[in-house]
């Protein structure tokens, strides 16, 4: 799979909706260390139906993010936008990723920053908890370790 481009270059999210007062971007990158060991690269694998799990995780995250605690959006505050969000864009790469490459990209546009921040964080958490994507991490000593298996 090709590296994810700068989110601003994607036609799906290049323009911020006129109703948005906030855009939050989460760019989950491959880092060069984990648990005190040097990391050389990662290989992500996914269940054949991972996309269905991803869509459910995003729906669950939006529902949780907009309905609970600080940043919750009341029907009155949402106005014409019943969901309280203007746009959501999510991509998770599969395959070999090098240090510094983007593994997970989440972009949330909303009328207000609290909802955008909260939903973005909830999307990342729900993806990690629900989506069958597995990470094989390769270390500088030649060893590797499978992790993140929901």
Where are these regions (language model features)?
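N-terminal, polar/charged subdomain of small-to-medium soluble alpha/beta proteins
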Residues: 1-102, 107-121, 125-150
